[in-house]
Amino acid sequence: KEGPALMSRAVIADRYRLSWLALRRRLDILKGRATVHPLAGLFYWTSPGERLIIAPQELRTADPTRASEIYAGRFAFAGKIVICDGRSPFEMDPPNEEWAEELLGFSWLRHLRAADTAITRAHARALVDEWITLQGSWHPLAWQPEIVARRIISFLCQATLILDDADLRFYRRFLRNLTRQVRFLRATDTRDGIPRLQARIALTYASLCMAKQIRHLRGATRRLVQELERQVLPDGGHIGRNPGAIIEMLLDLLPLSQTFSARNVAPPPAITNAIDRMMPMLRFFRHGDGTFALFNGMGPTSSDVLATVLAYDDARGTPVANAPYSGYQRLDAASSMLLMDTGGPPPPELSAEAHAGCLAFEFSSKQQRVVVNCGMPGSGRENWRQVARATAAHSTVTFNDASSCRFLDFAPFRRLFGVPIVEGPENVTVARDSEHDAIVLRAAHDGYAERFGIIHERFVSLSADGNRLEGEDVFLPATGNAMPDEADDRFAVRFHLHPAIRANRLTDGHGAVLLLPNKDVWNLNAHEDVVAVEDSVYLAGHDGPRRTSQIVIYGRAREVHRVHWSFSHVPQTTPAGWRGSPREQLPP
């Protein structure tokens, strides 16, 4: 039923739309390439930035030990290591595209700056000079707009490192190349989402930091404000629905705001307002252990980066409970917390990292995550990325082993759009209330309505003391009173567990006991249904994929219209007869 022959009209329309966007993207790159052609001066006149006025602050954390590795010719990016053996890294064959993108974005210069020695400064200058020689005029990957944007920001932020002790010849050569990159980016559109926003930020930085670029500040700022108003939602979330995008935006916007002030120019109110909206969302998505919830492309949380950004949060208030524009809900009670995805997928061109996880939730107690989603793996693990986006990788319900969204894996689009979502839940309803001193959430989605004729409705209730989480999954016919054919009604209610949790199935089969690292015990009770404890994989670990467990309730919607389950805290230590064992790390 999911083959190309039955592809809906909406999917076909989205394919045509993506084809048009892909054509526009290629035309934009051709236009941008014309601006860096050796004869471009005959057609494009741009005053060179004769000098740099200011170097913005870099908020991304740096490791001075990485400088020694780079000096030794070991370039470790995206989970891969390339040893240069005296050759330039820009002449090496990259092990994967992610490695090449990190190399060509030059964000790693911050590690050399952290070492802050004459040797690292000279080495940084030599590497930049090598790149200008080998790829500074043109290179098909190095001159992709999103990489150019990242490189402009890196060159400006690390200008002190690059130019300290530089001779006049290199100084002028560097500025000529930087001007060329700015000119290219100004003439080229970038793919939608965070890359486009970073391009707007890069051009605004250039207008503030380069002496002869100030005349472009008004236009650059106007375009940046337009993107902020479009991409940052009223509740502070990002239009692409990835929680990690908030951190990425703030890492660039916070120092940009400071750069405006350093030039005695008031930052546009839209920048300040966007920052003020995003800051509370940092706390909204955080569990008790400080990590972000694993929804829609979120992978491992960099605790040091998050702490750096949170240091700019003057309010330090209680997290908001409701993010309706972003499509998330949060329940807090005592030391327990639940986060649920209650939104549909973003537009196809913004959905390269979005997941089919509607109505999935994560649950934590104190400083320990209990129920999680599998999460997005770190860079360099492409074989896991599409697995992570499937509905089965989330703590929600699947029907017939299918995802609630359709993904379009079409080779011509992969470089430009990844694997976008072209069909998913269109109607997601959510209601929030309080009943009997408990916070109650009711939500439903129609992601399975067209294919299987089923509406999934989920009810969750968290007690005031945080010791009991009640839940119910209800399966309703999408039209009339008829349930789907027997062949189409197989469901699985999944609860993926954090790798630190040990799970043991109860002898009656109707539940499981969960032991937390702090020796707290929680019971999962499935009441009238039978549970299975199965293997799962936690993908969002800093050290790679890890084995873990999932608790699954299987059934048929024609026979079981409601599945009632609950998690309850047990005031006792390790239960007698415990047979659980710690989880192991998976091979990459």
Please identify what each model-predicted range represents.
Residues A40-R66, K80-A114, P195-S207:
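Long, acidic, intrinsically disordered low-complexity segments
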Residues L104, A199, G327, L359, ...:
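Residues that flank catalytic or metal-binding motifs in active/ligand-binding sites
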